[in-house]
Curated annotation (Swiss-Prot):
One of its GO terms (biological process) is DNA damage response. Residues 1-40 have a biased composition (Basic and acidic residues). One of its GO terms (cellular component) is cytosol. Divalent metals such as nickel and iron have a similar negative effect on YqjI DNA-binding activity. One of its GO terms (molecular function) is DNA-binding transcription factor activity. InterPro entries: Tscrpt_reg_PadR_N (IPR005149), WH-like_DNA-bd_sf (IPR036388), WH_DNA-bd_sf (IPR036390). This is Transcriptional regulator YqjI. The gene is yqjI.
Length: 207
């Protein structure tokens, strides 16, 4: 069953048309920019704040799985899902309604969730049997997504440390200066690579 859902659309939130997506959303969701993208990106800081490199939290199909996993614990509403994802990423990424609701529409079209209107205009979102089955078929991927998000959140916290930021900025500046020299030789490049590899290894050996 998973091949039908995972392969029917190239982008999160895009409805299926004759077996594929005919359109591509032109919006992108980056930190500090009022654009939207279904994959969800952040800058190591809270969505809506500028600065830092963009970092993608969710790849193709991953936001759908995260939403289904949240719904497997309890029924929800759109704004609650947004908050749950924000909590999952420790505030580093907050999906906009323009990302969440098209994705929910897609999941409903695939019979993975139901959306029922309640009194007051709220819409209750619930997981279907098909949705639960697809989620279980992809449980290993869900766990990998969660582990990757935890690691990225730790990295974002480290980058907020002033000394860590200074050290990283210094490293990037020196590397950029040396590598972009017009007269740099192959031997010098190999030495730089060896230094980077050695530093990476030394970091892995720290207690």
């Amino acid at each position: 069953m998973s091949h039908h859902h995972e392969g029917c659309c190239k982008h999160e939130g895009q409805p299926r048309h004759e077996g594929c997506c005919k359109g591509e959303k032109s919006e992108h969701e980056h930190c500090g920019h009022g654009h939207q993208h279904e994959h969800g990106q952040c800058c190591g800081g809270r969505h809506g704040r500028g600065g830092g490199r963009r970092q993608r939290f969710f790849g193709h199909g991953e936001l759908r799985l995260v939403i289904l996993d949240i719904l497997s614990r309890d029924d929800s509403h759109g704004y609650e899902l947004i908050k749950a994802i924000e909590n999952l990423t420790q505030g580093n990424y907050t999906p906009s309604p323009g990302v969440i609701y098209p994705t929910l529409d897609f999941l409903q079209e695939q019979s993975l969730i139901t959306i029922r209107e309640e009194e007051g205009g709220k819409k209750q979102i619930a997981l279907t049997e098909q949705g639960a089955q697809w989620l279980e078929e992809n449980r290993e991927q869900v766990e990998m997504i969660e582990e990757r998000i935890k690691a990225r959140c730790v990295g974002a916290a480290l980058r907020q440390n002033p000394q860590m930021k200074r050290a990283l900025d210094n490293f990037k500046a020196v590397l950029d200066l040396r590598v972009n020299q017009s007269d740099i030789s192959d031997a010098q490049i190999k030495k730089i690579i060896a230094v980077i590899d050695r530093a990476a290894f030394d970091i892995t050996q720290l207690d």
